[in-house]
Regions:
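Short, aromatic/basic-rich helix-turn unit that serves as a nucleic-acid recognition element
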Residues: 1-24, 37
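N-terminal DNA-binding recognition helix of tyrosine site-specific recombinases/integrases
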Residues: 24-27, 35-40, 57-97, 144-146
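Basic, Lys/Arg- and aromatic-enriched nucleic-acid-binding interface segment
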Residues: 64-67, 71-75, 91, 97-151, ...
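Short, charged phosphate-coordinating catalytic segments
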Residues: 82-94, 138-162, 260-262
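Catalytic-site neighborhood detector that most strongly recognizes the C-terminal catalytic loop/helix
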Residues: 107, 111, 191, 215-216, ...
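C-terminal catalytic core of tyrosine-transesterase DNA break-rejoin enzymes
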Residues: 136, 140, 147, 223, ...
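Conserved tyrosine-mediated DNA breakage-rejoining catalytic core shared by Y-recombinases
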Residues: 150-195, 273
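Active-site/catalytic core of tyrosine-dependent DNA strand-transfer enzymes
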Residues: 170, 187-238
Length: 296
C-alpha cells in the first residue's frame, strides 16, 4: 500500500514529504504487524492511536505526541489505506477513519520578556558556538526552529544591501504554511549569528549552516529543541522556551508601531485580510526599517 501511494503521489514530492508519510506507516507496522488491509480492525486502529499518544519515541527520550501530531500521523495512515482500497476496488471499511482523539489544552508558550532576550543574546555571544548561533538567529528574526535549523548556505545573503535569509521549502524541510515562504532581514545578533554560521559552513565545506541537525534526510528539529531549551532553562525561568522568541518578535514589532501586514510578512504568519494577498508584498527595505527598531 505504501509503495502504491509513493508510485501514484510521489512525483514532485520532497524527501521530507515522503518521510512524513513513511514514518507513521513504519511505526504502525512495528506495532500492529504487516498484514492484509482487510485484517486490520478498529481495535488495531485505537491501539496504534494510543501508542502514538503514550509511547512514541520514549526510547529516544522524546515527548509523547500532541493530539494535532497524532492526527497528522493518522491522516498519513488514512491516505495510504484509502488509496489502496480505491485502486484495488477492495471495498473495505477503513478502521483508521473517524477515530476519537483526546482533548488537550493547547500548550502555552509565552513570549520571552525583553530583559530575558537580552540576557540570552549576551550569553550566546559569550559562548559563541553553533548552538548559540542558532538561538541568536531565532531571537532577532522570529524564525521557527525548523526554518532556522534547516537553513543552507544558499539561503543566506550577506552581500545584499539588506542582509537577509530566505525561508523556502527544501528536501530536508517542508514549510508549515504557504505564507511561510519569505525573506527575513538580518539585524542585531541574528546578523552576527548568520555571519558566524556561514563562515563555519564554508570552512567545514558543508551546505548547511547547522550541520549537527541535518545529518539525516530531514532536519532534526526535535534534537535541536531539546538541547537548546535545556540550555536556556539553565539561565532564564523554565516557562520560556525557544518558540517564545517568535511570540516575542510579534510583541516587539507591535511596540514600534509596525503595520500588521509587515508583521505578517516578517513572521510568515497567515494574511489577516484578502487585500494582503494581492501584489508582491513589501520590499526588504521596508521590512528592514521596522526590524532595526526592535534590536535590543
Amino acid at each position: 500500500a505504501l509503495s502504491l501511494h509513493h508510485q501514484m503521489n510521489g512525483d514532485g514530492k520532497s524527501k521530507n514529504d515522503l518521510n512524513h508519510i513513511e514514518r507513521p506507516i513504519r511505526r504502525l507496522l512495528s506495532i500492529l504487524g504487516d498484514k492484509p488491509l482487510s485484517d486490520y480492525t478498529r481495535t488495531d486502529a485505537n491501539k496504534f492511536k494510543d501508542w502514538l499518544y503514550d509511547e512514541t519515541d520514549h526510547a529516544l527520550n522524546k515527548s509523547p505526541l500532541s493530539t494535532s501530531s497524532v492526527k497528522r500521523s493518522m491522516d498519513s495512515v488514512n491516505s495510504v489505506f484509502n488509496l489502496a482500497n480505491q485502486e484495488h476496488s477492495l471495498k473495505l471499511d477503513n478502521p483508521f477513519a473517524g477515530l476519537r482523539y483526546r482533548k488537550q489544552e493547547p500548550k502555552e508558550r509565552p513570549a520571552i520578556p525583553v530583559e530575558h532576550i537580552a540576557q540570552i543574546q549576551g550569553l550566546c555571544q559569550k559562548f559563541d558556538d553553533d548552538m548559540r548561533w542558532l538561538i541568536a538567529l531565532i531571537s532577532d528574526t522570529g524564525l521557527r526552529l525548523g526554518e532556522a535549523a534547516g537553513l543552507e548556505r544558499s539561503h543566506v545573503d550577506l552581500s545584499a544591501e539588506v542582509p537577509h535569509v530566505i525561508v523556502e521549502e527544501t528536501d530536508s524541510r517542508r514549510l508549515k504554511t504557504k505564507t511561510s515562504k519569505r525573506r527575513v532581514p538580518l539585524v542585531g545578533v541574528a546578523l552576527w549569528a548568520a555571519r558566524k554560521a556561514l563562515e563555519a559552513s564554508l570552512q567545514n565545506n558543508t551546505s548547511f549552516l547547522f550541520p549537527r541537525y541535518n545529518k539525516q534526510a530531514s532536519t532534526n528539529s526535535n534534537s535541536a529543541s531539546n538541547g537548546l531549551n535545556k540550555w536556556m532553562k539553565e539561565h532564564i525561568p523554565p516557562q520560556y522556551v525557544l518558540h517564545g522568541f517568535r511570540h516575542a518578535m510579534r510583541d516587539r514589532l507591535r511596540e514600534v508601531d509596525c503595520p500588521q501586514d509587515v508583521m505578517d510578512e516578517i513572521g510568515g504568519w497567515s494574511k489577516s485580510s484578502v487585500g494582503q494577498t494581492y501584489g508582491q508584498g513589501s520590499s526588504l527595505e521596508r521590512l528592514h526599517r521596522y526590524m532595526k527598531k526592535v534590536v535590543i
